[in-house]
């Protein structure tokens, strides 16, 4: 049921954004329209109106992604972790993940993440994802840390300038570094500080992946 055609209007707006590849900051647009309505005497219902509208649009985005045959777990992984207001950006992440998930790039990325994620789940530690480079004892720790920082710099660029395909392929290529890390580094070191620091490195690793989508929501991770 859609008596006021709100769902249809929202889907129409999102399709226009996607079809025209518009990198719009919808929060600004929504705030501007609310201001115009207030100037005409319409009272703002609550102070959270912008977030409620954005969440409503995000839910409608699920319908569009399903129509594009995006896998359900990819949709959940992206929607649950997305707090921006650029919905073309969200669409790009979904289509790219769907494209690569069963190819070597996707398989490598998921495999690397799963190994780190399962160790963190077993450890059940409260971690920040900020390891101390001073505590690294193995070259493999240093190399993984350096590679993660390189990828994180790419994530920090403006949304419209991000090359998400390149970012996803970078997450896949990090498997070389994680394989060497797991082959040569004992996470549960006898020294508690070193052990915790290695867990922090793995937390940083998972956090980096989750900047793309929440990999923990993908099928076969846990």
Task: Name each region found by the language model.
Residues 1-222:
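Amphipathic alpha-helical "coupling" segments that flank catalytic cores
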């Amino acid at each position: 049921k859609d008596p006021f055609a709100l769902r249809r209007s929202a889907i129409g707006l999102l399709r226009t954004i996607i079809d025209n590849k518009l990198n719009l900051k919808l929060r600004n647009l929504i705030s501007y329209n609310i201001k115009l309505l207030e100037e005409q005497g319409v009272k703002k219902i609550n102070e959270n109106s912008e977030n409620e509208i954005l969440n409503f649009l995000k839910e409608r985005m699920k319908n569009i992604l399903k129509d594009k045959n995006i896998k359900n777990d990819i949709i959940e992984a992206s929607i649950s972790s997305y707090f921006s207001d650029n919905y073309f950006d969200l669409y790009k992440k979904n289509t790219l993940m769907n494209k690569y998930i069963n190819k070597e790039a996707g398989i490598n990325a998921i495999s690397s993440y799963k190994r780190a994620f399962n160790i963190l789940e077993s450890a059940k530690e409260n971690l920040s994802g900020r390891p101390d480079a001073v505590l690294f004892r193995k070259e493999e720790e240093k190399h993984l840390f350096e590679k993660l920082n390189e990828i994180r710099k790419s994530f920090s660029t403006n949304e419209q300038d991000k090359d998400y395909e390149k970012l996803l392929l970078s997450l896949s290529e990090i498997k070389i570094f994680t394989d060497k890390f797991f082959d040569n580094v004992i996470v549960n070191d006898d020294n508690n500080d070193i052990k915790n620091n290695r867990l922090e490195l793995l937390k940083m690793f998972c956090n980096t992946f989750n900047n793309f989508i929440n990999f923990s929501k993908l099928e076969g991770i846990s």
